[in-house]
Amino acid sequence: MATFSQKPAEVEKKWILIDAEGLVVGRLASIIAMRLRGKHKATFTPHVDDGDNVIVINADKIVLTGKKYEDKVYYWHTGYAGGIKERTARQIIEGRFPERVVEKAVERMVPRGPLGRRQMKNLRVYAGSNHPHEAQQPVVLDVAKLNKKNVRSA
């Protein structure tokens, strides 16, 4: 019997809605990355984008464990000499785009390459509880019930 290899035309993508309120960032990101890659499916094929579309709401209400809220630093470079920039997780979460903490965590758990970039386009993260994807009829995934460690009361 030959190894099963799914073709891109055979892929069935579902829409999944996750409420991130009170969830631990790393645990949430690992579940999202698994769903984006399609590793939760029996038809997983490493070189095919067979993951689901994931919508994350309330990304501004995520929780970091330990002292990471104050101490975790995100670095980036502008491209100019001496252009290294840094922000703490607190500055990002309390700033204009709090959803970037979740996006970065997931981005670093997905493979770096053309397939990983395509899979990241299937992730939509929103700071509030509103999202424009009601027409897709997303299925709600309760991450808090998967494991008691996924939730941390602030």
Curated annotation (Swiss-Prot):
Q: Does the keyword Chaperone apply?
A: no
Organism of origin: Rhizobium rhizogenes (strain K84 / ATCC BAA-868)
Q: Which HAMAP family match?
A: Ribosomal_uL13 (MF_01366)
Q: Could you name the domain of life of the organism this protein comes from? A: Bacteria
Protein name, please? Large ribosomal subunit protein uL13
User: Which InterPro entries did the record assign?
Assistant: Ribosomal_uL13, Ribosomal_uL13_bac-type, Ribosomal_uL13_sf
Q: Which cellular component terms (GO) are annotated to the entry?
A: cytosolic large ribosomal subunit
Relate the assembly described in the record.
Part of the 50S ribosomal subunit.
Please state the span of the N-terminal signal peptide per the UniProt entry.
none
Q: Which SUPFAM superfamilies does the record match to this protein?
A: Ribosomal protein L13
Q: Which family does it belong to?
A: Belongs to the universal ribosomal protein uL13 family.
Give the keywords, sorted. Ribonucleoprotein, Ribosomal protein
What the protein does? This protein is one of the early assembly proteins of the 50S ribosomal subunit, although it is not seen to bind rRNA by itself. It is important during the early stages of 50S assembly.
Q: Name one GO molecular function term.
A: mRNA binding
Task: Name a biological process GO annotation.
Answer: translation
Q: Does the keyword Ribosomal protein apply?
A: yes
